[in-house]
Amino acid sequence: MINDKLPKIWHGGDYNPEQWDSKEIWDEDVRMFKLAGIDVATLNVFSWALNQPNEDTYNFDWLDEKINRLYENGIYTCLATSTAAHPAWMAKKYPDVLRVDFYGRKRKFGSRHNSCPNSPTYRKYSERIAETLAERYKDHPAVLIWHVSNEYGGYCYCDNCQDAFRNWLSDKYGTLEKLNKAWNTGFWGHTFYEWDEIVAPNMLSEKREDNVSDFQGISLDYRRFQSDRLLDCYKLEYNAIRKHVPTSIPITTNLMGTYPMLDYFKWAKEMDVVSWDNYPSIDTPFSYTAMTHDLMRGLKGGKPFMLMEQTPSQQNWQPYNSLKRPGVMRLWSYQAIGRGADTILYFQLRRSVGACEKYHGAVIEHVGHEHTRVFNEVAQLGQELNGLSDTLLDARVNAKVAIVFDWENRWATELSSGPSVSLDYVNEVHKYYDALYKLNVQVDMIGVEEDLSKYDVVIAPVLYMVKEGYAAKVEKFVENGGTFLTTFFSGIVNETDIVTLGGYPGELRKVLGIWAEEIDALHPDETNQIVVKGSRGILSGKYSCNLLFDLIHTEGAEAVAEYGSDFYKGMPVLTVNKFGKGKAWYVASSPDAEFLVDFLQTVCEEAGVEPLLDVPAGVETTERVKDGQTYLFVLNHNNDEVTIELHGSQYREVLTDEQVSGNLVLKEKGVLILAKV
């Protein structure tokens, strides 16, 4: 578990008492926290200016008081380091802390995410305050976990970053000869003869307004570099804390799901527990949120994660900040728990009275009392989580299907000039996840370093970049009986975005048994057809596809379906290749949702992968396992009640402790946690 001092699913969230200079409000907060079943408060996230009013002075008296007051009332602390926004005095005295943006403009003091990760000043003072906090609170019994900074993100293009980038490149490549080869600098006369000729790629150099780069290798390495340097800032604080704090107290920082700018698989290696902030928009598919939970779980090989933030009701920063309808907050909380979360924490516990987050939802609203819909829903959930105790803590998700997600592959795809501006890597990954979600098939989201042998089916949509050794890894997996599936625009380049010669899909050509001669790109509104030859499983008839169209030739693979129109009518669009004891599928275009459901049902049936439960549309299933006991979550996202058929199995419904079997009526936004008897 995260910390055995609190052996239950934690319930709490961000608390900013420094925003109210009122003992009466603080006392009321504690009273209402207890009513709501709040047992963890995240403190000190944005308090650097309060903690350090000048270069030589620290003030933690206020923090002592708040930690102690909460602890006296049974509420633990998730202690942040306050470094998410530097103080104004620092920006004034040491302007090197201020970022230079993508357009080459030097930022002024303001907002947050405003510190240059390569600023000597920022690195010095952030490390120092983290260590000062650790020395002060290392033995405090209230502190369950340390929270470094907040939602790291954003790049900088200043001279310090440029110099650090050159050093990073020197360490990576060793010589300019190797760098020039890796970047293909013979193109457009870009050969470098001195390290200081290399400049940061932004709008003043290699980048374009639409995020495409003229030199993908340069821009790809700059993303790697910035991700690494921001990670290094985290590690500076982590190591400063760990000097004084025992390993029994974990250290984390809050991630942001599919956030594009940081390689979270690399970050997770440095985190004791993964935590993340879940803020779906009004039109986010439920399956997308489920996928992101699974991705966060996958960052550390399936270990449970923390839901560090979610709003109790509405947000403030999206175009349309709708309220969570009655029951939705509870429903989405159990969605997180069902997919591996061992905490349910909110932003924020009391609503801010000023600045940009004053309209962001909170447990305690501006009215200041507990007689609100949101508070009552939070309190109900708090009561249920107390009742669950440690039942679900450390429970794992066992999946036989994995989907590969790789940030560097995503970057390379996004930076490429062509073949289509509409190609969205995350969207293509989600399309495959969504089909499996509808089929009630449990999925792990994995990185390219993950062991494949524990899976029956591995799906790698748009595997544009094939890293060294990965093709051999796939071949071994398939040879040993696994099913591998990839798609159009795969196997094109290596890790520095240099095309693999010899024909697409490059190093995957052998295992797939195909050659892609050309890639057609059409407007997303223009479609072709996937015409199945005969039938395979439930796959039959015609389906639609769009976006990109690989024109492929079989080299040992079987053509299962063909294009239905255009000059490549009759050419293969879906192939399967027997390889060793297994098989490898190739989908040469971007199919419609109906095709993916039918296709992946066929793939899973052939691989012996079964769904968790047959349920109506709009109902989500997921399962966790602990000590041999399975816990099946059934979540009704519909606005109407549904009937769940248990097909003769006997269960104990965990939330009510009732024995159930046969057909169950599940109300709108309802939740079941079924332990098999």
UniProtKB/Swiss-Prot annotation:
GO biological process: galactose metabolic process
UniProt-annotated binding residues for Zn(2+): C116, C156, C158, C161
Molecular-function GO terms, alphabetical: beta-galactosidase activity; metal ion binding
Pfam families: Glyco_hydro_42, Glyco_hydro_42C, Glyco_hydro_42M
Highest taxon listed in the record's lineage: Bacteria
pH dependence comment: Optimum pH is 6.5.
Regulation: No activity is lost during treatment with 20 or 100 mM EDTA in Z buffer for 3 hours at 0 degrees Celsius, nor is activity greatly stimulated by the addition of cations. Inhibited by 1 mM zinc and 1 mM copper, the levels of activity decrease to 10% of the untreated control. Nickel, cobalt and manganese at concentrations of 10 mM decrease enzyme activity to either 40% (for nickel and cobalt) or 60% (for manganese) of the activity in untreated controls. No change in enzyme activity in the presence of calcium and magnesium at concentrations up to 50 mM.
Known uses: Possible reporter enzyme for halotolerant and halophilic organisms. May also be used in the food industry to digest plant polysaccharides in high-salt processes.
Active site: E151 (proton donor), E309 (nucleophile)
Matching InterPro entries: Beta_galactosidase_C (IPR013739), Beta_galactosidase_Trimer (IPR013738), Class_I_gatase-like (IPR029062), Glyco_hydro_42 (IPR003476), Glyco_hydro_42_N (IPR013529), Glyco_hydro_b (IPR013780), Glycoside_hydrolase_SF (IPR017853)
Residues that span the membrane, as ranges: none
Catalytic activity line of the entry: Hydrolysis of terminal non-reducing beta-D-galactose residues in beta-D-galactosides
Cited Gene3D superfamilies: 3.40.50.880, Glycosidases (3.20.20.80), Golgi alpha-mannosidase II (2.60.40.1180)
Protein residues bound to substrate: R112, N150, W317, E357, K358, Y359, H360
Entry keyword set: Glycosidase, Hydrolase, Metal-binding, Zinc
Documented EC number(s): 3.2.1.23
Gene Ontology, cellular component aspect: beta-galactosidase complex
Thermal dependence of activity, per record: Optimum temperature is 42 degrees Celsius. Thermostable at temperatures at or below the optimal temperature for activity, but it is rapidly denatured at temperatures above 42 degrees Celsius. Irreversibly inactivated within 10 minutes at 55 degrees Celsius. Stable during storage at 5 degrees Celsius and loses no activity during storage for 4 months. Retains 10% of activity at 0 degrees Celsius.
Subunit and interaction comment: Dimer.
Protein family according to the UniProt entry: Belongs to the glycosyl hydrolase 42 family.
Primary role: Hydrolyzes o-nitrophenyl-beta-D-galactopyranoside (ONPG), p-nitrophenyl-beta-D-galactopyranoside (PNPG), 5-bromo-4-chloro-3-indoyl-beta-D-galactosde (X-gal), o-nitrophenyl-beta-D-fucopyranoside (ONPF) and p-nitrophenyl-beta-D-fucopyranoside (PNPF) with greatest activity towards ONPG and PNPG and low levels of activity with ONPF and PNPF. Detectable, but very low levels of activity towards p-nitrophenyl-beta-lactose (PNPL), p-nitrophenyl-beta-cellobiose (PNPC), p-nitrophenyl-alpha-galactopyranoside (PNP-alpha-G), and p-nitrophenyl-beta-xylopyranoside (PNPX).
Protein name: Beta-galactosidase BgaA
Source species of the chain: Planococcus sp. (strain 'SOS Orange')
